[in-house]
Amino acid sequence: MMARRDPTSWAKRLVRAQTLQKQRRAPVGPRAPPPDEEDPRLKCKNCGAFGHTARSTRCPMKCWKAALVPATLGKKEGKENLKPWKPRGEANPGPLNKDKGEKEERPRQQDPQRKALLHMFSGKPPEKPLPNGKGSTESSDYLRVASGPMPVHTTSKRPRLDPVLADRSATEMSGRGSVLASLSPLRKASLSSSSSLGPKERQTGAAADMPQPAVRHQGREPLLVVKPTHSRPEGGCREVPQAASKTHGLLQASRPQAQDKRPAVTPQPCPPAATHSLGLGSNLSFGPGAKRPAQAPIQACLNFPKKPRLGPFQIPESAIQGGELGAPENLQPPPAATELGPSTSPQMGRRTPAQVPSVDRQPPHSRPCLPTAQACTMSHHSAAGHDGAQPLRVLFRRLENGRWSSSLLAAPSFHSPEKPGAFLAQSPHVSEKSEAPCVRVPPSVLYEDLQVSSSSEDSDSDLE
């Protein structure tokens, strides 16, 4: 029976058994980790990762071959300047330097042409070259050469004469007279007197169309411009544009001594002119003194201000004519004005204290701006005992709410300039005929408005 057993067969069986054991140990697919290594609550002490322990073969610290080495993303040849350029010399200029050189040569070639044109227009001789042979190479040199004298800026400038007065001879300009108008001395201003009118305008008696410019002073106050003349009394109306100041009333000026021995002159209207503020009472001096005084009367005209807020009330184009400026006071009205009602006396009584001459005080600002004021001048022929004729002026003012008030104003005598209150109210004779009516509103409308507004003015005086 022992001979029947083959040793080769036994060896084959042993090999088969060993192969089967190897196949059982080595799995066909990936080996699943044991359940203890998959616990996320575990933490490796070597790498600090969760899911395995330090003894596990999954730890990258134990198997470095399995760890991936970080590879570079790429070379930075375009960003890094591995081969910097060398600075190019003038012998081998680059394309940018060539363009700059061409641009610099062009203006240098144009400099001689520009200088030639500059000398042609300015009329100056050409500049001599420098001894070292180096001229100005800047392209903006032609802008620095002045073609004419630089303007000189001064603070005080003389007023420009009108084109009509520009062709006057030197004799007429030297014969200009100076006129001093003495008013309430609230403020003082000095104005330059304008030239006399042309011979044609003297014959017609028309005022100059273009008003003379005057020096502008501080504040919004009226401006007074007086034009002396050496012609006969029929000369044109002198322009005295002036807006009423903050106190209510009108201004009067004293006449020259030459007028006291002459008859009354018919007043003529004056065109409106631009006005600037000076004040109610100011001492005005005009121009340089002449060899002889003015032989013609100075006729004042109060004209329209440019804006209503420049003065307490507006003055229409038809202004007061035939009289001069001065300090107004109350006068007893003539028989033609006695029917106007009691509204005139309290109003003028309130305004007279504000017009007392004072140097340091300013006009009060109590009353609001009144809309309009219209004045009329009537010839006042004095009786025996008065040398000259003095005009009598009636002032109509339009108050608030369409009310009207009237007042009588007369020019003072020239013999007593220190007393502005000396009026010609002593003369009982007053002509009833108005030589130069200035009021455009019918008298009946004024009388009705004054009679209706008498009670309202009394209430205003009580409130003030």
Curated annotation (Swiss-Prot):
Organism annotation: Homo sapiens (Human)
A Pfam family matched in the record: zf-CCHC_6
Highest taxon above the source species: Eukaryota
Biased composition (Basic and acidic residues): 74-89, 97-114
Cross-referenced PANTHER family: FAMILY WITH SEQUENCE SIMILARITY 90 MEMBER A11, PSEUDOGENE-RELATED, PROTEIN FAM90A1
The name this protein goes by in its record: Protein FAM90A24
Other facts: Primate-specific FAM90A gene family, thought to have arisen during multiple duplication and rearrangement events.
Lineage start: Eukaryota, Metazoa, Chordata, Craniata, Vertebrata
Family annotation (InterPro entries): FAM90 (IPR039213), Znf-CCHC_6 (IPR041670)
Compositional bias of kind Low complexity: 180-197
Signal peptide region: none
Protein family: Belongs to the FAM90 family.
Disordered: annotated span: 1-42, 69-389, 415-437
